[in-house]
């Protein structure tokens, strides 16, 4: 690993860490700020659903736009940084606008922050795929995911620490961190474009259509959303009191982060699609076992395995999206992938808003839904890859 690759990778890890923590701060304080703005509590989940719907649309559009902006080296980074400054400003103003008791102003700022923050979802990954060489790409992508995993592990602790804090300081710190980090996007783009070897042109035929890939991503993302957000806490509560959940929920993300280093090697050796398929298959087994683990120790082992499997799925999916989009459509493919992540999150919140997760007749089905989704994704991917191999052979 060269020093430039290491520095750019650490930069992307920090960018993802700060961005994900900003979203965590938003989730923690949204109910209180919305109440101050005069918005009924019953609207909270629907605001979050609307946020994810905005991501579904904006992520794909922003990714496609990034493809066009990146045709001239050095043009994309500064523009993304400028958009992020507007995003950080809207985010910063949320706790100051809430006491004005204007629901419209609060919702407008929320919308502005959500739609502009799409600049930090697909486009940075597109930069990695467009400019990073074959050797550097897994390292940088792995560090990018490591930042995401660290934020996921910290989130439960932040929820407890910040629950009763003044919202203005966390919002200010998060806004400044995101804005300052994003401002260096031009530096990252320039170094990626000049310090790494040119990316080889792909073969004329892709391993599978982008549409099929997005179906696979949607299945794995829905499995993750239901498992981590709806199933994990009830599984732990079979063995521990609710007060211990803050220490146990990060176990999934510990497995996620521990998998990063070996996955960097596995991606290089076996390729993105095989790692994605293996991650989905292992994840299906892990989450299925978690539903019937007979002790806390076995449940922790299952959660660690599920976290490592989700890391393999995301790592493989990121590389697969870049490969399917090359050359010239990396942003379109990665934007579509992030749209599917947002779509799955929207479905999960919709389940909660409509109380489907409380329906006793559906709870058993929901418990097995993550395993079914991940197994279906693995099976579909293997079938498509075999069909491609047979056609080529």
Predicted stretch roles:
Residues 1-55, 212, 216, 221-238:
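Helix-loop boundary and gating motifs at the non-cytosolic
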Residues 160-177, 353-375:
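A membrane-interface helix-boundary motif in multi-pass transporters
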Residues 327-359:
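A late C-terminal transmembrane helix in Major Facilitator Superfamily
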Residues 90-97, 101-120, 298-312:
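Hydrophobic core of transmembrane alpha-helices in multi-pass small-molecule transporters
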Residues 76-93, 274-289:
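Structural signature of the two symmetry-related core transmembrane helices
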Residues 57-74, 163, 259-272:
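Helix-to-loop junctions at the C-terminal end of transmembrane segments
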Residues 119-132, 312-326:
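Intracellular juxtamembrane helix-capping segments at the cytosolic ends
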Residues 138-157, 338-349:
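Glycine-rich segments within core transmembrane alpha-helices of 12-TM secondary carriers
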